[in-house]
Amino acid sequence: VNSATGTALAAAGAAAAAALALGGCSVDFGVHTETRSYDVREDVTAVRLTSDGGRVEIVGSDAPGIAVQERLRWSNSRNKPRPRHSVADGTLTLSSSCGHTIIGGGACEIAYRVRVPRGLALQVTTDDGAISASGLNGRLTLRTGNGPITVRHLRAPALSAHTDSGAIRVSGRAETADLRTDTGTIQAAALQAARLTAHTQDGRIHLTGRADTADLQTDSGGIDATALASRRLTARTADGTVRIALSTPPDSVRARTDSAAVRLTLPASHSYAVTLESQEGSRRISPAVHQDNRSPRTVVVTTNDGSITVDAA
């Protein structure tokens, strides 16, 4: 195992005056901070980052090598975070741990900003903190227990983004995109994907772009997929309105909601085998929608208690 080389900018002082004199450290109402920066010069093909807490920012770059900035934050000398980094078998591993905390707890976290070559594979896991990634072309796996996930300017073979509590925002391209949050909105703006999964238990789903196969699901929240191109689309909600407007004729659409309305807009250029089922709600199909029970393009919309509207565009 080869350790990556680095330099600490300064060590934290015990008083504000001492912290100001050191430059890289500060003390703010009992909270200490320290910033460390270093470069990793070994050959690296993947990065694995694990953190108990703190914001993580990953930036793709055309520059060679990896640049790491760590901002430590702690409340007393007994729980100062201890960062670690090493390179083995082409993987840079970044991790940290906290010291013993006093009764009543205390602050202990490291915020990371890591600049990497665009094509590296990345795996980021943090218990508590936001994750942002931009300008990346490698395989991405992002996990946070509490915090939003933002991915921009993506050009990746695969993206997996999971958060227990927080919003997910994604733009760019991915062969496969798996987006999941227990509590929070999922927003995919102009996303291009061969296969998309977007699941949230409590939150809305907003989607534009292209997804050849799309699986959208929310327990409590609506689904808004407008200006979308999709060949195979499944949309399910327990309690939330479904609004879908497809810009290209689909092969298959399956939409279901337990207690809300469904509004679907299809291209008028093709015919569809349409099935609408609602126990307690109206059903309306525009005359502009070409229906043909023999069509290979199938549309099935089901609600327990909600209206169904199918229009043509």
Residue ranges of model-derived segments:
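Surface-exposed, polar helix/loop patches in the mature regions of secreted/periplasmic/lumenal proteins
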Residues: 102-136
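Generic recognition of long tandem-repeat/solenoid scaffolds
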Residues: 68, 90-97
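Core solenoid repeat modules with strong leucine/isoleucine-rich periodicity
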Residues: 81, 88, 94, 297-300
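Short acidic/polar N-terminal linker immediately downstream of export determinants
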Residues: 2-78, 99-115, 283-294
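Soluble periplasmic/extracytoplasmic beta-strand elements of cell-envelope proteins
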Residues: 48-50, 57, 93-95, 113-115, ...
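Right-handed parallel beta-helix
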Residues: 123-180
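Short, exposed beta-strand/loop patches in secreted or surface proteins that constitute
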Residues: 82-87, 290-292
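Short, surface-exposed interaction patches in beta-rich subdomains
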Residues: 170-173, 177, 188-313
